[in-house]
Amino acid sequence: MNLLLLTFGDNTDNHQQAVFAALSFMRDPHIRRVLVVTDRPDFYRWLCGTERNALSTEEGGEDASGKHGMAAAVEILPITAETLTSWQGPQQFFWRIKIQAVAMAVRQYPGQHLLYVDSDTFLAGSLADMVRQLGAGAAYMHCFENRLGDRNSRTLTRTRRALVGRTLEGIMLSGRHEMWNAGVIGLPASTAAERVAQALQLCDAMCATDCPRRLIEQFAFSLALQQGTLRSCQDVIGHYWGNKAAWNRLIAGFLAEARLKDETVAQAVARMGQVDWRALPLEHRQRRWVLRLKAVIDWALPPKKLRHFTPG
């Protein structure tokens, strides 16, 4: 199975997340290749290093089933700013690029299972069951979130009003259709090309309506993959979108130690076995009034003293 990550821009936090995610997935022998679609290939030179030797027992090179394997090969698929603009399509919907990156990987390696993950994810269990289910034709997304008919957010309400009753790409939309989190997308080799093409068509069709765009690419994948068996994987893959600041600190420390110790990629992959995935919450949301109070305090009580270096 191939793993796919999409990264872009100059924010090093995002790229460190991607490296950390890749290392966590490379512990599992079912991941044979890591594909990184990025406009900053220079950030992945260490990850692409040649010292990805087999993980020994002492290094912890095994998955939850006890199998040993090689650290996965890493392949960079470079893209340009022009590519990113083109991928946004005629309606210039930014997150259409996710669907295009998945389509690119499917074309690059047809006939192979593909697991796309957002950079802010990690593997904490075994992929053995997922691989079996993919082989049987099931697809994966991270987790079920809600149905279009649910009334738990303004964005969902606006989406429902714009889409329910429409027929898009042969699908008559109703309040029963489900929204799944697209932080993980697992595609079986047997239907990957077909489902990605359908997701792209659904995305473009929704962009042509007055539907709010924030969830369009996620709903497009959800609709396309609901045409078959769709499963959750949140019991083995963590998605810390709701607590990035805390996880970024953990990741920065992990990668700094890897470089200070001059670890090989294989050694860093093995050290992933020491990470306590339950130590930090995946989601940590403050009440709005707390955030406002902090802002007022910062404004009313500025630092007592600030001093910068002055060259002689």
Please identify what each model-predicted range represents.
Residues 98-150:
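GT-A fold catalytic core of metal-dependent nucleotide-sugar glycosyltransferases
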Residues 250-312:
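Long, low-complexity C-terminal extensions of enzymes
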Residues 168, 172-259:
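Catalytic core and acceptor-binding pocket of nucleotide-sugar-dependent glycosyltransferases
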Residues 1-88, 107-110, 286, 290-312:
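N-terminal anchoring/stem segment of glycosyltransferases
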Residues 15-19, 92-95, 99, 119, ...:
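Conserved glycosyltransferase catalytic-site signature
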Residues 131-192:
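Conserved catalytic core of nucleotide-sugar-dependent glycosyltransferases
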Residues 35-38, 113-118, 123, 140-141, ...:
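A structural signal for short, well-ordered beta-strand segments and their strand-loop junctions
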Residues 27-32, 104-115, 189-194, 227:
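Secondary-structure boundary elements
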